Each structure stands twice: as C-alpha cells, then as structure tokens.
C-alpha cells in the first residue's frame, strides 16, 4: 500500500498596501416606478389619486402594465380646498367622478404582468385580463395596435421598476 506523503507549500508573502478609505454611497432607484411615470400625465394622475391606487402602482412587488391615457373624457369641477388654517382657501379643479367610477377606470386599464408591444403584435386579436373583475382589454394588432377599437398606443414600452407603461391617445373603455 502506498500512502501519500503530506507536502507543504510556501505561501507567497502578502503586502498590505495603504489604501484610502472608500465611502460607499447608496443611490436611489435608477429606474422609476409605474406611479412616477404615470404621475407625469395630469388627467390620469388625478384619476389614480382619486381611486387611491398610487400605493398600488408604487409597490415594487406588484408587476403591472398600465395603459395611461393622455385625456380622460370627463368633466372637471372646481372645489375650495384649505391647505392651512392661516391661508385662504384656494380653488382646485378635480375630476367629476365618484370613487367607484375612478377605481373601475384605473383597474380597467391595468393588466397584471408585463405586456409589451411585441407580445401584442404576435397575434391578430387577443383579449387580456385586467385588474377589473369583468372588463377585458381587447387588442387588434394589424396594421397598428388598437385597444378596444378606440385608442392607439402613442408611446409604448416605457420601462418601470415594477412593470411597463404604454401611453395611449384616449381612454380605451366606455365610461
């Protein structure tokens, strides 16, 4: 029987180089959330705030695709709002919708998961489930992407940290 004889290896000498202390800065999120992108468009931002869904669109664990319209076909009313006891009330224009109507409108244009324009172009006609209990988003893709036979995508595939945002020209659902 042969046994292996233990061998020793000489480790090279290590030298400690003087290095300055490195300060590490933590940067904020580089890619904005869906709420940050949607809040750039004032009519839809008002609709999301009225539906109290800004925390839902800002949640990093929720992966969602939102079709944000540039205009919303509702009337606006003005309300007197007091921001501070020392200042006089100011007039603010708000959408003339109830909470339930604005919630249904936002839910009907948000699709769970990531839905890119390439995915929409793969078939001629597809219906996608939305966050609304019974409304679907119908997509025709030949020759251009048409949502519910009413609206076109103006800017597509705006990447967010928790999903995608597509900017559409008008609201794709009947109110």
From Swiss-Prot:
Protein's organism: Invertebrate iridescent virus 3
InterPro entries: FAS1_dom_sf (IPR036378), FAS1_domain (IPR000782)
Start and end residues of each FAS1 domain: 28-172
SUPFAM superfamilies: FAS1 domain
Protein name from the UniProt record: Putative FAS1 domain-containing protein 081L
Top-level taxon of origin: Viruses
């Amino acid at each position: 029987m042969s046994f292996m004889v233990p061998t020793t290896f000489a480790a090279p000498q290590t030298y400690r180089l003087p290095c300055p202390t490195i300060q590490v800065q933590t940067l904020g999120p580089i890619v904005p959330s869906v709420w940050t992108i949607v809040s750039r468009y004032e009519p839809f931002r008002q609709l999301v705030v009225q539906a109290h869904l800004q925390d839902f669109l800002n949640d990093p664990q929720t992966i969602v695709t939102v079709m944000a319209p540039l205009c919303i076909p509702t009337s606006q009313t003005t309300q007197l709002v007091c921001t501070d006891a020392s200042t006089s009330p100011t007039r603010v224009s708000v959408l003339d919708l109830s909470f339930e109507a604005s919630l249904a409108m936002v839910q009907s244009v948000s699709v769970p998961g990531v839905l890119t324009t390439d995915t929409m172009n793969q078939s001629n006609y597809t219906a996608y489930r939305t966050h609304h209990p019974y409304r679907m988003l119908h997509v025709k893709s030949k020759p251009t992407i048409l949502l519910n036979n009413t609206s076109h995508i103006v800017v597509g595939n705006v990447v967010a940290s928790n999903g995608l945002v597509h900017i559409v020209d008008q609201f794709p659902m009947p109110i």
